[in-house]
Every structure is written in structure tokens, then in C-alpha cells.
Amino acid sequence: MKTTPGLRIFKPIIPHTPKPDSRIYVEDAWTMLKPAIRAIFLDEPQDFACSGLFNAVNKSWCEKSSGEALYKLILEECEIYISAAIQSLESQCDTDPSLFLSLLEKCWLDFRRKLQFLCSIAGGEGQTVGPHSVWDLGSELSPKHLFSAQKVRDKLLSIILQLIRDQRSFMSVDMTQLKNTTRPVMSVHMTQLNNLRGLFYGQSLYKSPFFKKPFIDCAVEFYSAEAMQFKEQSDIPLYLKRVEYVA
């Protein structure tokens, strides 16, 4: 009886190709991305190749370590420009509240527009590194530098507190304009404050770090003055009735 020889299976020898160091991806991406960031934020002519930049950056996003390194570089570079923009407003702190809010609003919306364009060419708007995305840059950088720019911060605070005082004094302040309206009230465009809410890192305005204590102090001052005025203008029974009603 003839036997069929066994089948031999040959496995091709595939040479091992070492995986490229992730730092190379970061270096390649940053070489292209850094001048692009500068051009975007300084409104310079944009002569970079968007497709090549997009591909280089996306290689860095593929690994956690390289993605974190690139995110840090982007954060530090963008911080230079948002810091300079907010600091430039310090010379405008003596202007009319309406004009000041217009300048601050323009600064914030301009930064968001440029950041959105950066995300579109770097593939970063939905790209997360840990819990963060490149889009979170605006939420991290803007309040940080607003709170550290004392003159700008205090000017904005005084405008908001004055609006609150006027409202509590039953003056014609339509606070609903904080929600997407455009009419000017008392020479201050309330829609600007609505646009500026992003400066508070998504927090309630009254819980934001720089606003909470001054707001409470303002409330105490206002109601103390109101109580004193009512006491001076009313007899004791009416005053006690008022206290009981407020309590």
C-alpha cells in the first residue's frame, strides 16, 4: 500500500520591526503644530498643510503617553496667547461698562473661534486625553487668567454686582437677557454676560471662585441697608411684621 507523504507547512519568517518611539510622533506633530498655533492666534497667513498636520497629530493621539505629551504642549502654547489677550484688557478697565463688556466678549469669542479652528485641523475637538479634550482648553485657560488678572476680574465683578443691586432696587433691569437676548439694558448688553458664561468654567456664576464671597457680601450689605431704611420709615409694629414676613 502506498502512503501519501505528510503535508509540510512552511511558516514565513517575518522580520521583527521595532515599534517607533512615541516621542517621535510627538516631535513630528509639534514641529508642524506649533507654527500653526502661532499663525491661528496671531491672525497670520496660514501656509501650513492641513492634511499633513492632521495626520501627524493623529498619530500622537493613538497612544496615551504621546497624546498626553502633545496635549501639554498645546496647553502651554495656547496659554501664552489667551494670557496676553486678557492682560491687554487691563488698560480698558476705566472705560464704560458696556464698552468693557464688549471688549471682554470679543476676546472670549475670538479665542473660542480660534480654538475651534485649531481642533478642526488637529483632530482634537472630540479627542480626549484622560478626562480632558483639546476643547477643554478654553474652559481651563480662560477662567485661570481671568481670575489672575485682578483689574479685569474686579471690573467684571463690579459690573455684575451693580446689575444685581439695580434689580433688587426694582430698577428696570431685565435679567432674562442673560438667556440669549440682545437688547441693551441700562447701557449694558446683558447678552454679553450670557456669552461670557463660558469664562466661569461651566460653573454657576454664583458659585465661581472669584464671585461667591463678593456676591454674599453684596447681599448682606443690600439687605442690611434695606432693613435700616424700612426701620427708620416705619413704626415698630409694621417693622416687626416686616421682619416676620422676611424671615
Curated annotation (Swiss-Prot):
Gene3D superfamilies, sorted: Cullin Repeats (1.20.1310.10)
Domain of life assignment: Eukaryota
Pfam families for this protein: Cullin
MF term (GO), any: ubiquitin protein ligase binding
GO BP term (any one): ubiquitin-dependent protein catabolic process
Family indicated by similarity: Belongs to the cullin family.
Protein name per Swiss-Prot or TrEMBL: Putative cullin-like protein 4
Organism of provenance: Arabidopsis thaliana (Mouse-ear cress)
